[in-house]
From Swiss-Prot:
The keyword Cytoplasm does not apply. Signal peptide: none annotated. It catalyses: ethanolamine = acetaldehyde + NH4(+). This is Ethanolamine ammonia-lyase small subunit. Belongs to the EutC family. Pathway: Amine and polyamine degradation; ethanolamine degradation. It comes from Pseudomonas syringae pv. tomato (strain ATCC BAA-871 / DC3000).
Length: 287
């Protein structure tokens, strides 16, 4: 009997794949190889594992208490809200319910707005969306980076408003109830087979109930393997400045931030993920 561990499955029968080197450049499922007319065992097992991770991300419970505790350590107030979707099944089967707050949460915001008149520049919303995993991993690090830059520019931000069973449009109601000039929602994106923890940012100027996607700007794939926290914050602040100047957001407001002037996170946050591609020189990702 072989001494090879059972969990180290090798496909010795799989022929060499000349595209294999391309896998250094992307997490996409390319150059999987073949054995006969089928995928090698390792590729099939990897696919099944990725699919299971994506399913788990959709159904993972939103640990808002842990996020609140982390933000409290940084001196940030949080307010817990809930959409009109009572549970996960309702959320998945009735997308419209996830776009509105329940009555209790709406009243909570009315009371807060009455106690804090004068409005604010940006309402900051965090919602589980379709991947609570993304929010657990990336919301606090991103908010830390955003608030450092926003404070330096003099923007006024709301407490962090955390929404259970929330969808993107719930931010419009929140912004309207608070009288905020702008709103951004950090939300878990639909998991992919190579990205179960992708965080999306959706920004709206003059939020109100009934706006559609054309009124929002999206900054997607915020995670260590995607768009860095620093770049995402840089883009969002650019959109905030331009939105206030032009009083628009969405398809009429293009993201023309000069990202090439931004240091792309030389900190430990991203120091291990810089790569090149076919056209640009750059260090390769180690195997």
């Amino acid at each position: 009997m072989s001494d090879q561990p059972m969990n180290e499955v090798q496909d010795n029968a799989a022929p060499a794949n000349p595209w294999l080197e391309l896998r250094r450049l992307t997490p996409a499922r390319i150059a999987l190889g073949r054995t006969g007319t089928s995928l090698p065992t390792c590729a099939q097992l990897d696919f099944q594992a990725a699919h299971a991770q994506a399913r788990d991300a959709v159904h993972l419970a939103f640990d808002h208490a842990a996020i609140s505790a982390q933000l409290a350590e940084k001196g940030r107030e949080t307010i817990l809200l809930h959409s009109a979707a009572a549970d996960r099944d309702s959320y998945l089967q009735r997308p419209d319910l996830g776009r509105r707050l329940n009555d209790e949460s709406a009243q909570t915001l009315r009371d807060y707005a009455a106690a804090h008149p004068g409005g604010l520049d940006l309402a900051v919303v965090v919602a589980d969306g379709l991947s609570a995993l993304a929010v657990h991993r990336h919301a606090v690090p991103f908010l830390t980076r955003l608030e450092e830059q926003a404070s330096a520019e003099g923007w006024t931000l709301s407490p962090v408003l955390m929404v259970e069973q929330g969808r993107v449009a719930v931010a419009d109601e929140i912004g309207e109830l608070l009288g905020a000039k702008m709103v951004v929602i950090l939300i878990g994106e639909r998991p992919g087979l190579s990205s179960p923890d992708s965080l999306g940012l959706y920004f709206t100027y003059a939020p109100k109930v009934g706006l559609n996607d054309a009124h929002r700007n999206c900054i997607s794939n915020v995670r260590l393997e995607g768009l860095s926290y620093a770049m995402a914050a840089h883009r969002l602040l650019y959109l905030m400045r331009e939105a206030c100047k032009r009083q628009i957001s969405g398809v009429s407001l293009k993201d023309e931030a000069q990202l090439n002037t931004l240091e792309s996170d030389d900190s430990a946050e991203n120091s291990d993920r810089k790569i090149g591609n076919f056209l640009l020189d750059g260090p390769a990702v180690p195997h």
